[in-house]
Amino acid sequence: MHATVSPSRVRGRARAPPSKSYTHRALLAAGYADGETVVRDPLVSADTRATARAVELLGGAAARENGDWVVTGFGSRPAIPDAVIDCANSGTTMRLVTAAAALADGTTVLTGDESLRARPHGPLLDALSGLGGTARSTRGNGQAPLVVDGPVSGGSVALPGDVSSQFVTALLMAGAVTETGIETDLTTELKSAPYVDITLDVLDAFGVGASETAAGYRVRGGQAYAPSGAEYAVPGDFSSASYLLAAGALAAADGAAVVVEGMHPSAQGDAAIVDVLERMGADIDWDTESGVITVQRSELSGVEVGVADTPDLLPTIAVLGAAADGTTRITDAEHVRYKETDRVAAMAESLSKLGASVEERPDELVVRGGDTELSGASVDGRGDHRLVMALAVAGLVADGETTIAGSEHVDVSFPDFFEVLAGLGADTDG
């Protein structure tokens, strides 16, 4: 599918979708629990549906009721799945469920779509093998399809922190119900650390204790997942909100604003988008008590931003940089190349097609907004929901029509993105 976006002025109120990261973790935590847990206000998207299906294949149940997800847990010992677990495009599902599958007393096979089958899982496979299980890639390259044999009983394991923080999350969540717990020692600096903070936040809400250590993280074994009141409410998603906030900062109508609701403080690192916009000179206000962020169109200036902990913000920041005066330098970005696509290369290519002056480096993306006049063009979302949404925001301020291929991939995290954008006044047929 293709979506077109034409130059537009936007205004009004919108609510960002619930957090994808929190929804994934809440669904699996509810799977680890005994009995029934209601996950309230979840994100229902292609990725989170993949996690719900995995919970069912591991012996639990996940039913939609009145906008919530009612999950019946499989407890501390998942069943051996009677089919291959298809994680579709969801790397979070594959990493978290691979560790869960290592608790089963038997063999589990996991796969995904073409994009997911190109993403790295080797450090997690090595860790599970070091904990007493057997975990391997069928192609011997650390990529799916994966075959996992359990059960693991716990222990200590070393793994790199600069490939994916999801490996740590997977081991913490599974480790709580092992006999002895799991301790991870990180051999390299942890990238995307706020995502582990999200995990610790969810574990705490489910009554599970885990902590950071001098060398990594530790979770005690023999714990039980038991959320207060047998329910858990998912907060709003700052990654998704970033596109709406960027739209307001770049394209709000004169005297008007874009107001994004449901944005209460949480452990999400991508709340940093508010600080980034402030540093660029945006007229933005966050009422943390009400969870409302208001942003008006402003003259922006380039800044330097490190994305070691916020890889999902790179596409948004790159678009802001293309429309700002001066140079925006996005650093600590090498790990962003291992997402649904190589987001550094993809944004460099797409913004260049739109007329931006962009320089791609191994660990950086440099956008020279002062040398840029954005013009509409046909660009490819590369099957990556975050590229599609960021490029749609660029289309609001490009001269002429911007056509984005692969617009259907917004279903991964923000299924009604184009409807929300149109509701704010954008000229789009997405």
From Swiss-Prot:
Region (Disordered): 1-20
PROSITE patterns from the UniProt entry: EPSP_SYNTHASE_1, EPSP_SYNTHASE_2
Reactions performed catalytically: 3-phosphoshikimate + phosphoenolpyruvate = 5-O-(1-carboxyvinyl)-3-phosphoshikimate + phosphate
Pfam families noted in UniProt: EPSP_synthase
UniProt GO BP: amino acid biosynthetic process; aromatic amino acid family biosynthetic process; chorismate biosynthetic process
GO molecular function, one term: 3-phosphoshikimate 1-carboxyvinyltransferase activity
Compartment annotation: Cytoplasm
UniProt entry keywords in alphabetical sequence: Amino-acid biosynthesis, Aromatic amino acid biosynthesis, Cytoplasm, Transferase
GO cellular component: cytoplasm
Family annotation (InterPro entries): Enolpyruvate_Tfrase_dom, Enolpyruvate_Tfrase_sf, EPSP_synthase, EPSP_synthase_CS, RNA3'P_cycl/enolpyr_Trfase_a/b
Transmembrane segment boundaries: none
Binding sites annotated in the UniProt record for phosphoenolpyruvate: K20, G91, R119, Q166, R343, R386
Pathway terms, separated by semicolons: Metabolic intermediate biosynthesis; chorismate biosynthesis
Active site residues of this protein: D312
Stored HAMAP family: EPSP_synth
Family from the record: Belongs to the EPSP synthase family.
Subunit details: Monomer.
Reported function: Catalyzes the transfer of the enolpyruvyl moiety of phosphoenolpyruvate (PEP) to the 5-hydroxyl of shikimate-3-phosphate (S3P) to produce enolpyruvyl shikimate-3-phosphate and inorganic phosphate.
Protein name: 3-phosphoshikimate 1-carboxyvinyltransferase
